[in-house]
C-alpha cells in the first residue's frame, strides 16, 4: 500500500513537472513580448545588458530598441486614450501618451554573430510615445482587457 502511494505521488510530481516545463516553453504573448522589448527593467540599466536580455529570446542582435521608463500598467492606461491611426495607417488601434516619460534608446554599434557579444550605444531622453493595443489573449492577465502590443513611435 505504501509503495503504491509513493509511486502515485511520484507520478503526479513528474506529470506536474512536465506540464510546467511545457508551459514555460511557450513563446511570450504579444503583450508579454512588448514588455520584454520596451519596458525598462532596473536589473539591466545599460543598453548592453538590457539588449543581451532582450536578444536571448531571438538569438540575434536587434539594430535599435527603445525602452520606456514606466510600468506596464501605465502603458496599459495609455491604451484607454483616444484611438488614432498607427504609423503604417493600416491599423487604428494606436494611442498617444499624455505625458513624456524617460526613455533609453539603444543603437547597435558593434554587431556580432553571437548575440551576447553585440555592443550598443545608449541615449537617454524624455519623450511622448504611441502604442498599439489589442484585446488580451487567454494567456495574458485578466486584469487588463486591452494590452499594449506594439511601440509605434516616440516623439
Curated annotation (Swiss-Prot):
PROSITE patterns listed in its UniProt record: RNASE_PANCREATIC
Matches recorded under InterPro entries: RNaseA, RNaseA-like_dom_sf, RNaseA_AS, RNaseA_domain
Q: Does the keyword Iron apply?
A: no
Q: Where does the UniProt annotation place the signal sequence?
A: 1-25
Can you tell me which residues are glycosylated? Answer: 88, 107
Active-site positions on this chain? 38, 150
Protein location: Cytoplasmic granule
**Pfam short name (any one):** RnaseA
Q: Name one GO biological process term.
A: antimicrobial humoral immune response mediated by antimicrobial peptide
Taken from the UniProt entry, a GO cellular component term is: extracellular space
- Alphabetized GO MF terms: endonuclease activity; lipopolysaccharide binding; nucleic acid binding; RNA nuclease activity
* Task of the protein: Cytotoxin and helminthotoxin with ribonuclease activity. Possesses a wide variety of biological activities.
Q: What is this protein called?
A: Eosinophil cationic protein
Give the source species. Answer: Rattus norvegicus (Rat)
Q: What is the lineage of its organism?
A: Eukaryota, Metazoa, Chordata, Craniata, Vertebrata
Encoded by which gene? Answer: Rnase3
Amino acid at each position: 500500500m505504501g509503495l503504491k502511494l509513493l509511486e502515485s505521488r511520484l507520478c503526479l510530481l513528474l506529470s506536474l513537472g512536465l506540464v510546467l516545463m511545457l508551459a514555460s516553453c511557450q513563446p511570450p504573448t504579444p503583450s508579454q513580448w512588448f514588455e520584454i522589448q520596451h519596458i525598462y527593467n532596473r536589473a539591466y540599466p545599460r543598453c548592453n545588458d538590457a539588449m543581451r536580455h532582450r536578444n536571448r529570446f531571438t538569438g540575434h542582435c536587434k539594430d535599435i530598441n527603445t525602452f520606456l521608463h514606466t510600468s506596464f500598467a501605465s502603458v496599459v492606461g495609455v491604451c484607454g486614450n483616444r484611438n488614432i491611426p498607427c504609423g503604417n495607417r493600416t491599423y487604428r488601434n494606436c494611442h498617444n501618451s499624455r505625458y513624456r516619460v524617460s526613455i533609453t534608446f539603444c543603437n547597435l554599434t558593434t554587431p556580432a554573430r553571437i548575440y551576447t557579444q553585440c555592443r550598443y550605444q545608449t541615449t537617454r531622453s524624455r519623450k511622448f510615445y504611441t502604442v498599439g493595443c489589442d484585446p488580451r489573449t487567454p494567456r495574458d492577465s485578466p486584469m487588463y482587457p486591452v494590452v499594449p502590443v506594439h511601440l509605434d513611435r516616440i516623439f
